[in-house]
A protein has these predicted regions:
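N-terminal maturation segment of proteins
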Residues: 1-184
């Protein structure tokens, strides 16, 4: 995230240095859209900081199609987005799946270090999300027994990591003050 922040600052400097005075309106609109996106990312870094306060940022698998063109809410890169996969997994799809599922234990170990701001409401929803992920991974493991049995141990290891992360969230959540983060 530090690298992203540094790159954002550099891109913002470059954007401000662009003289748009002679541009047609349509290109000026594009410029302002880019500026707005950069401002949004800056807001994420300065205010929201989902990587340090929201366990749901560390989603590892999702099964549903979003109801909007892009995914809603912050999420880490590399989520297993199940609608993208066709079973049995083959070729590049299988390689990508393996890479992402193998990263789950590493990702969640890092998440424990990154989650330094403890917001009770956000952590509660993170616990619910991890329970769903455990159920999805359990079902996926059963499905892969028929189509890709070689992947079952990787999915089981990921499920164990999610279970361990959920237990850690529950333990930490239990010791938090009963205050609200002001969600909603």
């Amino acid at each position: 995230m530090q690298k992203q922040w540094q790159e954002l600052k550099e891109y913002q400097k470059r954007l401000v240095a662009i003289d748009t005075s002679g541009w047609p309106i349509s290109q000026q609109v594009d410029y302002h859209i880019v500026r707005a996106e950069m401002n949004g990312l800056e807001f994420d870094h300065r205010v929201l900081r989902p990587w340090s306060r929201d366990p749901s940022f560390y989603a590892v698998i999702t099964t549903s199609e979003p109801d909007v063109p892009a995914r809603e809410g912050p999420e880490i890169y590399g989520v297993l987005y199940m609608p993208d996969y066709e079973f049995p997994l083959k070729g590049e799809q299988k390689k990508e799946f393996q890479k992402k599922i193998q990263a789950v234990p590493i990702l969640l170990a890092q998440a424990k270090k990154n989650l330094t701001e403890k917001g009770r409401d956000l952590w509660y929803f993170g616990i619910i999300q991890k329970e769903r992920e455990i159920n999805v991974l359990t079902g996926l493991s059963r499905r892969l027994m028929e189509t890709n049995p070689d992947l079952v141990p990787l999915v089981d290891k990921a499920r164990e990591a999610v279970g361990g992360f959920k237990s850690w969230l529950e333990e930490e959540h239990g010791s938090m003050a009963r205050t609200s983060d002001g969600i909603g």
